[in-house]
């Protein structure tokens, strides 16, 4: 019998080297069971602060805490052995100073064992990104639409149509690449600009609502699986529709319990002989 094939966990360096070679497959993961299911199929799993909305029912990501991200990062690491695992830095955990960013990012790395952190921001965060990278913390950048800054841009909308807006996003991506990030998310950005940035910078671009022009794609798993139903962004394709199945299963369970058909004899522990 042949020995099972053991695959090493992908590293940020491997992800970076995928630019122009093979599209990077990425999804979000927040729990151990789901991470186990996604791990064999993904190059990168993101423990996203989107968990605040899809798991906890928050209206935005702004109330997500560092402790929450660490707890879910630990859960995802327990369920993975192949994908590169990156943990989002939540709002307020890195913007104050590069020293604050390092202190909190180091805690995330130490307490979860993840492969790197993701933070939002462009030119204004480049110094922080460089500071972290020089101290051994791989950084996944995030430009374009940045959910942690949604209140300053007037809500969730696509960006990059005007020259000024496009120029800002272009400069942001260049700054993050030059600062040493191993890859960068481009979110909610028009296709021509995403294509231009992908050709312009030497690190992979991972798109979410930025077209197939990017070097890879990421989606929120609960969107992709049809579990999160509060709203559906235009860029989401539902590859499954699990919400109705969950509801139907709960309905069937409730019906059997009320009719005393569950548990049946096959689900009951019998008394020991002679008891």
From Swiss-Prot:
It is found in: Cytoplasm. Keywords: Cytoplasm, Magnesium, Metal-binding, Pantothenate biosynthesis, Transferase. CDD domains: KPHMT-like. GO terms for molecular function: 3-methyl-2-oxobutanoate hydroxymethyltransferase activity; magnesium ion binding. Its cofactor is Mg(2+). One of its GO terms (biological process) is pantothenate biosynthetic process. The active site is at 187 (proton acceptor). Binds 1 Mg(2+) ion per subunit. 3-methyl-2-oxobutanoate binds at residues 49-50, 88, 118. One of its GO terms (cellular component) is cytoplasm. Catalyzes the reversible reaction in which hydroxymethyl group from 5,10-methylenetetrahydrofolate is transferred onto alpha-ketoisovalerate to form ketopantoate. This is 3-methyl-2-oxobutanoate hydroxymethyltransferase. It comes from Brucella canis (strain ATCC 23365 / NCTC 10854 / RM-666).
């Amino acid at each position: 019998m042949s020995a099972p094939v053991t695959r090493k966990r992908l590293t940020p360096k491997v992800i970076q080297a995928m630019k122009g070679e093979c599209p990077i497959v990425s999804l979000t993961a927040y729990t151990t069971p789901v991470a186990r299911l996604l791990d064999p199929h993904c190059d990168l799993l993101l423990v996203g602060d989107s968990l605040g909305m899809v798991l906890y029912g928050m209206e935005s990501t702004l109330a997500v805490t560092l402790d929450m991200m660490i707890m879910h990062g630990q859960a995802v690491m327990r369920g993975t052995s192949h994908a590169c695992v990156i943990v989002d830095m939540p709002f307020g955990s890195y913007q104050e100073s590069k020293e604050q960013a390092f202190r909190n990012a180091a805690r995330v790395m130490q307490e979860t064992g993840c492969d790197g952190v993701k933070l939002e921001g462009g030119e204004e965060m480049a110094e922080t990104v460089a500071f972290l990278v020089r101290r051994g913390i791989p950084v996944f950048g995030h430009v374009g639409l940045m959910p942690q800054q949604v209140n300053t841009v007037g809500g969730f909308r696509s960006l990059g149509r005007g020259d000024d807006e496009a120029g800002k996003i272009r400069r942001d991506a260049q700054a993050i690449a030059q600062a040493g990030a191993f890859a960068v998310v481009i979110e909610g950005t028009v296709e021509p600009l995403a294509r231009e940035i992908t050709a312009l910078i030497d690190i992979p671009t991972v798109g979410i609502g930025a077209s197939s022009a990017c070097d890879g794609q990421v989606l929120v798993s609960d969107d992709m699986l049809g579990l999160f139903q509060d709203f559906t962004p235009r860029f989401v394709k539902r590859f499954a529709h699990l919400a109705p199945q969950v509801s139907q299963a709960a309905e069937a369970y409730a019906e059997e319990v009320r009719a005393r058909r569950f548990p049946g004899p096959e689900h009951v522990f019998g008394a020991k002989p002679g008891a």
